Amino acid sequence: MRILVTPTSLQPGKGSKALETLKAFSDDLVFNELGRPLTEDELIPLLKDCDGYVAGLDSITQKVIDACDHLKVISRYGAGYDRVDIAAAKAKGIPVANTPGVNAEAVGELTFALILAVARRIPYLNDSTRNGEWVRSTGMELKGKTIGIMGLGAIGKVTARCAKGFEMNVIAYDPFINEAYCAEHDIGIRAFDELVQQADVIALHLPLM
């Protein structure tokens, strides 16, 4: 089985355990050598003779799907599949899989690391220290502040849990909010505009569309 692998973190030389697992499954792997998501015209020549497709953030349009008669399955390396023309895949009988929640812990932790970096001005202070300066800056204390989480899915929930550990007040907006979960974890439900007005920190975990 020939498989196209396009996610940039799954390319040779990246030390990915997932790639080693994939190599054990197939010895005919095709890789993305451009180091970025592929366009339609870049994708078709690589994909047209493949049976499987482990997809990154490429543009998987009807044009791409129609050009690939050997394709039997598309598996998104991530939770979202908004870049896949689901209707076109369904019309050709090609199942589309994704991996919801697989990176939630890592992304949620990174989100909070970035919040700390901004609140405590870590990048600026690091640069100034390297330049021989000694800038005194207290930054912003997070305890008691309100974090507004837009999108309370798997990643948003990890971010909320981290924020609770810092004794922050957590509010959330989600068009498909789980009221029972929010009640259980003391998360205030807000409308979009209310969250923007009330939050000291905003974490965005929704598609930009």
Walk through the language-model features, giving the residues of each.
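Rossmann-fold NAD(P)-binding glycine/threonine-rich loop
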Residues: 82-94
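Phosphate-binding beta-alpha-beta segment of Rossmann-like dinucleotide-binding domains, i.e.
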Residues: 92-94, 100-146, 150, 154, ...
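Rossmann-fold NAD(P) dinucleotide-binding segment
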Residues: 59-71, 85-88
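N-terminal glycine-/charge-rich "phosphate-binding" loop or analogous flexible N-terminal tail
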Residues: 1-50
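Rossmann-like dinucleotide/phosphate-binding beta-alpha-beta segment
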Residues: 15-17, 137-209
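An anion/phosphate-binding loop that grips the pyrophosphate of nucleotide cofactors and donors
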Residues: 50, 68, 198-199
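Short beta->alpha connector loops at strand-helix junctions that form conserved
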Residues: 33, 77-78, 94-105, 174, ...
